[in-house]
């Protein structure tokens, strides 16, 4: 994260992918018993998303599921990695899209 601003400003960067497990390993932390990530992990995610938006870089986060897809559609992402069919179904219903999209 120390060079995030400079990295995202490089011409030609089109996408940044973020994953909570990788970020957790970088920090040496793990999810709590309820499956929630520590605040430092979500803060890092939010910072990366903020810089990506500012620089016009697509933000792609792993871990999209049925419980967070609507929030991600409405406020943040363009590219999604679905954890299961439920996430795709909920997202399609929310956006009015039909298969194969």
Report residues per predicted region.
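Expand to "…catalyze enediolate/carbanion chemistry for C-C bond making/breaking, isomerization
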Residues: 1-101
């Amino acid at each position: 994260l120390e060079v995030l601003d400079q990295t995202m400003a490089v011409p030609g960067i089109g996408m940044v992918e973020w994953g909570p497990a990788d970020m957790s390993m970088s920090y040496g932390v793990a999810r709590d018993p309820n499956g929630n990530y520590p605040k430092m992990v979500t803060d890092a995610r939010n910072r990366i998303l903020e810089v990506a938006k500012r620089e016009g870089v697509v933000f792609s986060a792993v871990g999209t599921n049925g419980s967070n897809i609507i929030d991600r559609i409405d406020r943040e992402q363009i590219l999604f990695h679905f954890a299961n069919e439920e996430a795709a179904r909920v997202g399609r219903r929310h956006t009015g899209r039909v298969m194969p999209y």
